[in-house]
Design a protein with these regions (language model features):
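Conserved short alpha-helical segments that host acidic/polar catalytic motifs at enzyme active sites
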Residues: 1-151, 156-191
Length: 191
């Protein structure tokens, strides 16, 4: 994407799929509304059904990762704006996910309705924001913890705006944070 005030830094421990460079994230593409990049932490349990439906509709996949399913769902949507396309795509997937979707001027952050994977927002000293699955990432850039993204919530950051917008996409379910987050995946200095 062109130079802007937003960026993606992503390091994911793959628990499913291949370790091929084709399955590295972010996944980026040009589509009818412009350019987007997506990173995803989690697993979609209906990924095979969604992929088969997309292939039947003419989608061509470049990887084996379930993140690409989300990209195709967004790209094929007929909704007028990216936010509505993301919402429509999320209504078709089932599983554990934290997503960050970056366009030219907006960044969308979404957490699944069960809150299976952690996702937090931090504030940089210059007023900018950082989003990470582990709060120890904030320490590395001098950011302070603001809050967690709630289960079922979408956060929208817009270039040039100092505040972010919160949208309750899905009613939060009984929280089901993955036990492995704190005993295996996460660093001990993360909240």
């Amino acid at each position: 994407l062109p130079i802007c005030q937003m960026a993606i830094g992503h390091n994911r421990y793959s628990t499913a799929g291949s370790d091929s460079v084709l399955d590295a994230q972010p996944v980026s593409a040009k589509y009818s509304l412009g350019e987007i990049s997506i990173v995803h932490n989690g697993n979609l349990i209906n990924k095979h059904e969604v992929r088969e439906r997309l292939i039947e509709d003419g989608a061509i996949f470049q990887s084996n990762m379930d993140t690409e399913n989300i990209l195709h769902l967004i790209a094929k949507s007929k909704k007028e704006n990216l936010q509505d396309r993301i919402i429509e795509a999320l209504e078709q997937i089932v599983g554990a996910y934290c997503l960050l979707i970056l366009s030219r001027s907006k960044m969308f952050v979404v957490r699944d309705p069960y809150g299976i994977r952690p996702l937090s927002i931090g504030r940089l000293k210059d007023g900018g924001y950082i989003v990470a699955s582990e709060t120890c990432a904030f320490d590395l850039v001098g950011a302070t913890y603001v809050r967690d993204v709630a289960p079922g919530e979408m956060i929208v950051f817009e270039e040039g705006k100092s505040a972010f917008k919160s949208i309750e996409l899905f009613e939060a379910k009984d929280p089901r944070l993955c036990a492995f987050e704190y005993i295996y995946f996460a660093r001990p200095d993360s909240m």
